[in-house]
Amino acid sequence: MLLEWDEEIKAHLMWIWGGEDGFMKRKREGMLVVTEKRLIFITKTNMSYRIHDVHSQRQLLRFKEKKNVFLPIEGYGITELKNDIEKSDKNTVFTFSEISDMYFVERRWGTELKVKIDIENKQKNYGFAIVKGWVKYPAKDPLLFHHVDWNPIVTLFKMS
């Protein structure tokens, strides 16, 4: 799935816990990248651990300072995004035309972005949340989630 060169990354979020909703479906850690025409969930990336950690810490700092977290990150453009998409089949690309609905739900533990996808007359539901803290043993799982206003992403989708 090739991206057009005129697309622009609107938001790049780190520490995302997301995937398909449903019985016996395990979500994964990844990055959520939003362009003008697509929502992309990247679980396998060419980004080094050190660079990923730096951008994750910057995002955490923006949360603490109550600043806008829906920003692209420096040094990560369309070329890097294309390379990451091609790296693994587990990296998921949803065009806005495939998305039938996008909204967010405020829960006790955090805010979750819900996305309904229509692929070949089948509807699938996905959920994404920004992680605040992790537990690493016995398996890496999220411990806490951020309460986020997902309106900038939902508005971008509805205006497209």
What label would you give each PLM region?
Residues 3, 27-29, 42-160:
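Acidic, Ser/Thr- and proline-rich intrinsically disordered linker/docking segments
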Residues 37-38:
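Structural motif
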Residues 1-27:
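The phosphoinositide-binding surface of pleckstrin homology
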Residues 30-34:
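Broad, structure-driven detector of short, well-ordered beta-strand segments within folded domains
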